[in-house]
């Protein structure tokens, strides 16, 4: 068994983080992606690792050398990385791909230590790790049947929000047998590149193979394993929260001040949300008028106070619309001069309105 890592891309969306290095050299919580990945591969007793390099490839080679703590590394260079996509990078490594059973992985991933082992412990020779669709996911999706056969690859251009209940996201970690690579994948890869071009994705080849015979490649759905694909600065920020050490994780989330829908496994007890609002009828009305609400300019405060007066039967002159609960919390906290107990996690507007000596915190045992 060998591993093949695709690491040729420029990572432009990471801006200053990739100005002088390739994406896999970007640190997450102080550890470079490539160091984390190779450390995980070290535990598998592989024959070697093949890395396809391109942008800042020499810097990566200088950093890693040809041996990583006893793990042999072979490099394949993509000299036109700025004009091609990962299908070309993989095509350059087609000979290496056919020499051994292979774990194929993209270099901009961060994931739990057990992910590779999931593939190796499964007896099926050709597998794609997939995760049930969540709102933060982007890129290629798949649909699978009851036997975990991949029946369709859904490219980004064909994504349909009406079908998200059927979608699984490819984690971009695969296991290919030597036989599959030699007899199926590489022949189709060569034909596809010749017919369509080199500025494509290697998963498009898998899409064709599964269309012709969906029993060659199975999906392996993950459950609670953590992973993230780092394409831009926001991805990096989220990944640093998801993969923070236990001692840092609370502060990583506190510092976000909301937006916790990006972490679907988290229950938010900090911020002011109302499970009874909006009503189903109001949601339906908003959805029906979404385009108007999004594109038209809203009314001013005078009209808002009039509408509130109509809804609640209060004289308009007694109503002052505010910009959220934070304005009311400021007034509330100024009414009490004593110490106030705060259970954490909490809505930080409460303790932020008090001097430190007037806050009595209670922090229960916390674990994600």
What are these regions (language model features)?
Residues 6, 105, 269:
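Catalytic metal- and UDP-sugar-binding loop of GT-A-like glycosyltransferases, i.e.
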Residues 1-18:
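N-terminal nucleotide-binding beta1-loop-alpha1 segment
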Residues 1-3, 167-255, 261-265:
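Conserved alpha/beta core of the MobA/IspD/sugar-nucleotide pyrophosphorylase nucleotidyltransferase superfamily
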Residues 244-296, 368:
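N-terminal "arm"/small-domain region of PLP-dependent enzymes with the aminotransferase-like
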Residues 68-140, 146:
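Conserved beta-loop-beta/alpha segment of the NTase-like Rossmann-fold superfamily
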């Amino acid at each position: 068994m060998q591993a093949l890592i695709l690491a040729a891309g420029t990572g432009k969306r990471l801006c200053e983080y990739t100005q002088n290095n390739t994406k896999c050299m970007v640190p997450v919580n102080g550890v470079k992606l490539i160091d984390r990945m190779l450390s995980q591969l070290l535990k598998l007793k592989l024959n070697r690792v093949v890395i396809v390099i391109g942008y800042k490839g020499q810097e990566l080679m200088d950093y890693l050398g040809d041996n990583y703590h006893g793990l042999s590394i072979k490099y394949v260079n993509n000299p036109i990385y700025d004009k091609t996509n990962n299908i070309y990078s993989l095509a350059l490594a087609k000979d290496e791909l056919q020499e051994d059973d292979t774990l194929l992985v993209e270099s901009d991933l961060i994931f739990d230590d057990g992910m590779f082992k999931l593939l190796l412990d499964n007896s099926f020779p050709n597998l794609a790790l997939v995760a049930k669709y969540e709102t933060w996911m982007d890129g290629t999706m798949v649909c699978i049947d009851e036997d975990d056969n991949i029946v369709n690859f859904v490219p980004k251009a064909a994504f349909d929000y009406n079908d998200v209940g059927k979608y699984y996201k490819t984690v971009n970690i695969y296991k290919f047998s030597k036989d599959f690579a030699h007899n199926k994948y590489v022949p189709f890869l060569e034909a596809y590149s010749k017919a369509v071009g080199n500025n494509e994705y290697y998963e498009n080849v898998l899409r064709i193979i599964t269309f012709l015979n969906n029993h060659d490649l199975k999906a392996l759905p993950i459950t609670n394993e953590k992973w993230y694909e780092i394409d831009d600065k926001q991805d990096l920020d989220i990944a640093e929260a998801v993969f923070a050490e236990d001692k840092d994780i609370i502060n990583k989330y506190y510092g976000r001040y909301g937006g916790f829908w990006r972490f679907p496994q988290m229950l938010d007890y900090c911020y002011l949300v109302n499970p009874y609002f909006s009503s189903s009828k109001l949601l339906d009305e908003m959805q029906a008028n979404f385009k108007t609400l999004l594109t038209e300019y809203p009314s001013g405060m005078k009209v808002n106070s009039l509408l509130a007066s109509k809804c609640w039967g209060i004289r308009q002159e007694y109503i002052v619309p505010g910009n959220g609960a934070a304005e009311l919390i400021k007034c509330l906290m100024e009414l009490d001069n004593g110490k106030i107990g705060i259970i954490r996690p909490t809505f930080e507007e409460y303790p932020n309105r008090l001097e430190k000596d007037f806050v009595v915190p209670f922090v229960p045992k916390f674990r994600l």
